[in-house]
From Swiss-Prot:
In plastids the F-type ATPase is also known as CF(1)CF(0). CDD domains: ATP-synt_Fo_b (cd06503). This is ATP synthase subunit b, chloroplastic. F-type ATPases have 2 components, F(1) - the catalytic core - and F(0) - the membrane proton channel. F(1) has five subunits: alpha(3), beta(3), gamma(1), delta(1), epsilon(1). F(0) has four main subunits: a(1), b(1), b'(1) and c(10-14). The alpha and beta chains form an alternating ring which encloses part of the gamma chain. F(1) is attached to F(0) by a central stalk formed by the gamma and epsilon chains, while a peripheral stalk is formed by the delta, b and b' chains. Keywords: ATP synthesis, CF(0), Chloroplast, Hydrogen ion transport, Ion transport, Membrane, Plastid, Thylakoid, Transmembrane, Transmembrane helix, Transport. The keyword Transport applies. It comes from Rhodomonas salina. GO terms for molecular function: proton-transporting ATP synthase activity, rotational mechanism. One of its GO terms (cellular component) is proton-transporting ATP synthase complex.
Length: 181
């Protein structure tokens, strides 16, 4: 508690020795005149510097704005050119798509036509092969029938032909040949 009393008494002493902030009615003691003279000197002497600095800054800002506007114009012209190129590219792409579709249709029709021709050729080849096979089979059947007929006639002739009849046939054939010679 003694410490608290000691601190409070020191605070009272320091507040009595210090002056507080407030308005000082003594004009010369407050240095208002000195401050006014200093401020007017700064304004008078610094005006040219400040004016030239502001003019330089204003000129730089104007140049920066003009450069930005020029870049904007250039960017807009490049944008228009790019849009024109995009439109041309899209037209070319569309043309390529149409050509591709046309080519695809042509190839499809060609493949279908070739397929039909191949089917017709295979069908004709099949028919031709069947006809050849039929003719060959008919020929084989005729040969077989002829062979059977010859065998039957041979068997019948052997049964019918006697040695006496055979010599008569030979004599008859010789006499026929003798008249022709």
């Amino acid at each position: 508690m003694n410490d608290f009393l000691l601190i409070s008494s020191l605070a009272e002493l320091s507040s009595e020795t210090k002056k507080s902030f407030g308005f000082n009615p003594n004009f010369l003691e407050a240095n208002v005149l000195n401050i006014a003279i200093l401020l007017s000197g700064v304004v008078y002497l610094g005006r040219n510097f400040l004016t030239s600095a502001l003019e330089v800054r204003q000129q730089k800002v104007a140049e920066a704005i003009q450069e930005a506007e020029e870049r904007l114009v250039q960017a807009n012209s490049r944008l228009l050119e790019s849009e024109k190129q995009l439109t041309q590219a899209q037209a070319v792409i569309e043309e390529i798509k149409k050509e591709a579709e046309k080519t695809a249709r042509t190839v499809k029709e060609s493949i279908l036509a070739q397929g039909k021709l191949d089917i017709e050729r295979l069908t004709n080849n099949g028919k031709s092969s069947i006809e050849k096979a039929e003719l060959q089979i008919k020929k084989q059947i005729q040969q077989h029938i002829t062979e059977l007929a010859i065998q039957k006639v041979t068997v019948q002739l052997k049964e019918y032909m006697t040695p006496n009849l055979q010599s008569k046939v030979i004599d008859s054939n010789i006499s026929n040949l003798g008249g022709q010679l």
